[in-house]
């Protein structure tokens, strides 16, 4: 039985007559323990408590910053040794930004070209670099150095940080901008979120939408039967005469554009395991996008200004985006943390185009073609942060990325308009064709960094980084010889009446496979790097960041010449990269 005294120390305890043990406690005072106290009616007991002279030598408060908000990111900019700009998830949500590409556009000095290439101070795509949680990620597009930034939806992003200056801790392959995408982690309370949206574009919703025959949905990546690639040319020609080679035709159907749909499910949970903290976060989102473009035009010019060809076209694009994020964190011994992050993204774009115009020889041509691009990224990361007292800390991280770019079953049929009649265009066999191409890239990265703090705000940092990248590409073409085929054509969308298996079997159509050695290559790149850098205040308001990086780089590519001769090209370099950045507060 017990009672709490009021602010003046008065108390009343109702007990029966008898002998009791009484304990008195108060914060900041020594406990009082009285044994064998005899209590009768209206007994008065007063206690004089002595102050507890013990004092806390140090109080440590451990917390994790939530780097999604503007205020936290502003503090990061102020403390940063480099000139950086950043954009957090909360600001992206307020501004209605749906992916990283749209977010980067909001940062001063950066623009995105029509082809999706990043432009920084007039410098193109190959002058910049992209990292995910500080580790490099490869591009699935061989034409671009940077991965398409619209592959990262805002729902999986904690913040975007852009640095336009060089730092010795980063790979020395950029002079434009370093874009780091930080994925979300659970640093707050438990949550479960479900979002759903629907919409449409004024020039698309409810309008006619054309689509060439497709093998399944955009959730699936169509593939070519491997035996069609491996068999000899003689065996292929015989096989093609009597067997259906592809799961699709050149037939075009017309539908009505439906509303676009999207949704995201996310959850976060924090709990203790063996007295240590564990955090879990997961998120998956799916969205689709429909886009039509009517009466557009394209013209190709020579350097002299002469027109090579000019076409008007209508295009119909269907895009599917999938992104998934998983994060697992484990904190122990107060100042140590290890984590695992998984990120998956898939962008599939299917575009049908009908174009009509004239070529260099004044042929009046009509083209019906379909292109499907499927980009995917799978990234696994592990990381650890360890603090040893107030001066030393050790950070390590590693990642494995697998990116792919597939162009399955690109198809084209060309027609010519002559004397108000539409005929098959047979100037060369490339006018009616199919193409299958795939590019796969695997990348391993490891990083180890140790830091030593001295003085009030000075720091010395040293690290080692390793990167190994391998890329494989292969393309196969199938050309349709239509010289024996002369159908009556009234509708270019209806091709099943003449581009069919019956005409292949009777010899009116011949399908040729072109799989030349020059249509494939294998490449690789290995980098070993070490660096040392310091952040030093010579005087209070002046911060000097001085560093040097040494890289051993080996690059190679195995390819074939037009004549089919195997070649290897190598580039081995040892480079020294100094850096100096100063900041005056």
Model-derived segments and spans:
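Outer-membrane beta-barrel translocator domains and adjoining extracellular loop/strand segments
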Residues: 205-209, 292-299, 351-358, 407-415, ...
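Flexible glycine-rich, low-complexity coil/linker segments exposed to the extracellular/periplasmic environment
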Residues: 204-256, 423-430, 474, 479, ...
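Periplasm-facing N-terminal accessory domains of Gram-negative outer-membrane beta-barrel systems
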Residues: 1-62
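Transmembrane beta-barrel wall of Gram-negative outer-membrane proteins
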Residues: 246-353, 375-382, 388-389, 580
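Short loop/turn motifs that connect adjacent beta-strands in outer-membrane beta-barrel proteins
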Residues: 186-191, 272-279, 334-335, 389-393, ...
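Structural signature of Gram-negative outer-membrane beta-barrels, strongest in the C-terminal barrel
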Residues: 331, 343-346, 372-383, 389-391, ...
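Periplasmic N-terminal accessory/gating domains of Gram-negative outer-membrane beta-barrel systems
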Residues: 10, 38, 66-67, 71-120, ...
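Outer-membrane beta-barrel pore proteins
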Residues: 51-52, 93, 106-111, 123, ...
């Amino acid at each position: 039985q017990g009672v709490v005294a009021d602010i003046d120390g008065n108390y009343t305890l109702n007990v029966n007559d008898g002998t009791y043990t009484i304990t008195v406690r108060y914060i900041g005072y020594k406990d009082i323990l009285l044994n064998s106290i005899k209590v009768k009616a209206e007994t008065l007991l007063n206690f004089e408590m002595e102050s507890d002279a013990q004092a806390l030598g140090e109080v440590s408060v451990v917390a994790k910053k939530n780097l999604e908000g503007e205020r936290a990111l502003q503090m990061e900019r102020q403390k940063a040794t480099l000139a950086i700009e950043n954009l957090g998830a909360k600001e992206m949500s307020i501004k209605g930004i749906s992916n990283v590409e749209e977010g980067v556009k909001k940062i001063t000095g950066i623009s995105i070209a029509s082809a999706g290439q990043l432009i920084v101070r007039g410098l193109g795509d190959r002058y910049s670099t992209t990292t995910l949680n500080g580790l490099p990620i490869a591009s699935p597009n061989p034409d671009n150095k940077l991965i398409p930034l619209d592959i990262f939806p805002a729902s999986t992003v904690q913040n975007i940080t852009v640095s336009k200056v060089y730092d010795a801790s980063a790979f020395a392959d950029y002079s434009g901008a370093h874009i780091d995408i930080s994925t979300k982690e659970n640093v707050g309370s438990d949550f479960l979120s479900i979002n759903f949206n629907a919409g449409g574009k004024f020039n698309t919703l409810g309008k006619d939408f054309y689509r060439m025959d497709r093998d399944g949905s955009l959730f699936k990546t169509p593939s070519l039967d491997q035996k069609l690639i491996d068999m000899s040319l003689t065996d292929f020609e015989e096989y093609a005469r009597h067997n259906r080679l592809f799961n699709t035709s050149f037939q075009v159907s017309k539908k009505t554009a439906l509303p676009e749909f999207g949704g995201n499910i996310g959850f976060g949970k924090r709990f203790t395991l063996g007295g240590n903290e564990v955090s879990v976060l997961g998120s998956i989102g799916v969205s689709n996008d429909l886009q039509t473009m009517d009466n557009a035009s394209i013209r190709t010019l020579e350097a002299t200004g002469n027109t090579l060809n000019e076409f008007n076209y209508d295009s119909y694009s269907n895009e599917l985006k999938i992104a998934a994020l998983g994060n697992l964190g484990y904190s122990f011994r107060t100042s140590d943390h290890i984590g695992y992050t998984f990120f998956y993204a898939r962008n599939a774009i299917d575009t049908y185009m009908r174009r009509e115009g004239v070529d260099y020889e004044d042929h009046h041509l009509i083209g019906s073609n379909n292109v499907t691009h499927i980009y995917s990224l799978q990234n696994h990361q592990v990381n650890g942060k360890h603090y040893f007292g107030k001066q030393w800390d050790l950070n390590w991280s590693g990642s494995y990325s697998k990116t792919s770019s597939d162009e399955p079953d690109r198809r084209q049929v060309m027609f010519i308009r002559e004397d108000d009649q539409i005929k098959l265009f047979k100037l060369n066999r490339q006018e009616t064709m199919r193409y299958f191409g795939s590019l796969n890239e695997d990348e391993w990265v490891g990083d180890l960094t140790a830091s030593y703090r001295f003085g009030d705000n000075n720091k010395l940092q040293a690290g080692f980084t390793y990167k190994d990248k391998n890329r494989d590409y292969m393309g196969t073409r199938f050309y349709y010889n239509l010289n024996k085929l002369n159908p009556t054509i009234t509708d270019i969308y209806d091709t099943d009446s003449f581009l069919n298996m019956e005409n292949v079997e009777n010899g009116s159509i011949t399908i040729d496979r072109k799989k030349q050695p020059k249509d494939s290559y294998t490449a690789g790149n290995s980098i070993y790097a070490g660096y040392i850098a310091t952040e030093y205040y010579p005087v209070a308001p002046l911060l000097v960041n001085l560093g040097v990086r040494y890289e051993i780089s080996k690059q190679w590519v195995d390819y074939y010449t037009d004549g089919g001769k195997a070649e290897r090209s190598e580039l081995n370099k040892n480079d020294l990269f100094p850096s100096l950045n100063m900041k005056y507060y």
